[in-house]
Amino acid sequence: MWKRCLAGCLCGLLLSALGGCARMVPGASGEPAGTADSGSERSEYAPYAGLWGLTAKQRQEDFAYFEQQLRENYPCWGILERNGTDYEAILDEYREMAAQTDNDFELYVAVNSALYRLGGEGHLSVIDPEWFSGFQDVYNELAENGSAEGETRERWREVLNDPVTAQNYGKLLAAVTELNAGEDSSSNPDAPAADAENVTTLIIEEGKIAYLKIDSFETYDADKEALQAFLGKVKGYEHLIIDITQNGGGSDSYWMDLLVTPLSKASLSSTNYALVRNSPNTAPYLAEAFAADVLHPISELPQLPALEPRDRELATHFVETTLETEPLGSGFDGKIWLLVSERVYSAAEAFTVFCKDTGFATVVGTPTGGDGIGIDPVYLCLPNSRLLIRYSPLFGLNPDGSSNEEYGSIPDILSPAGESPLITALRAIREG
């Protein structure tokens, strides 16, 4: 058994809170770029043609490497096939764009847009230049302080701190910033308001029903005091409703330390299977995250009724991931309800899985977005541009063997079509 890293490391990571995929092309539209024939785009990107000083051959090498490594390492091809994603046509289109362009920035656009079109399953995305330094900071801090389990994630830090990679991302950030200058952020309806509160609290019925809404598991330090105060205030209530319907992820440490530990009354443990492709790019990360005897040959995986043959075919090994918590104090005496939706992803999904496995909370709402079983996404570094592509190295399974990324978690109580999970939960409370 392996106890999952509790340091968070933006697991689910920062981009997950923005919808689970990276920014696609500079600009507020969020739409993928067209082919290399798009004259307006070529004109816009012209000042950045020599961004990294690459030759035409180097740009083509990068895209070829990107494509080859994706085929060898990415674990979610089965999901794309079941979704009807024509990934061969998508890769063909952007391979041609990378071959035709004489512009370094358009290589970034080609890779970024290809990943957008592939759908972002399993955290698949380019590391956004606007978030690069944030990832560096988190892993550098982890290296200095270690996690609760003594983990440091050295492989992750090594890739992010490569001097050429950091320099190239600095140049890319400058270009993206210049291209985005003057854009109206209001044109992106998903962009959070600058002063939006991450935590919302409400007393629905004095002494009986308390409501806590958390939109992200990223802001641990900023939210810690407010959460402690509110949970202390409602400790004697009969019901606590925790709403994560808009929560796209963040850090597992957030929900484990700030919610489960203070509210639970006993030790809790959740164990899940995950498939692994112990392939060339992924192997160094797995070697750091797992002891050798934790990686079990796929032939030893128990029979699971909903496991897709294609998913098993891609895997070389499997692991059992375990999350464990200990109570802090006397806990919450009442009943806890967790509200979820399709927007729940990554670390928020991990919380949902934990609640269902342990009974910590009754889950109410609609099926979730998934990808909450695993470890931090790993990086694929293109050799010339040093662009970083991330993907989840573990393919998490629900108890029946179905893909957690694909199907998410099914709530204990499903909300009827058109009904908010809060109304569903309040009705369940009223009906006893």
PLM regions and their residue ranges:
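Extracytoplasmic/peripheral linker and loop segments enriched in polar/acidic and small residues
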Residues: 87, 91, 292-305, 407-432
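Long, folded non-catalytic interaction modules
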Residues: 110, 124-127, 255, 307-310, ...
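C-terminal regions of proteins
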Residues: 364-426
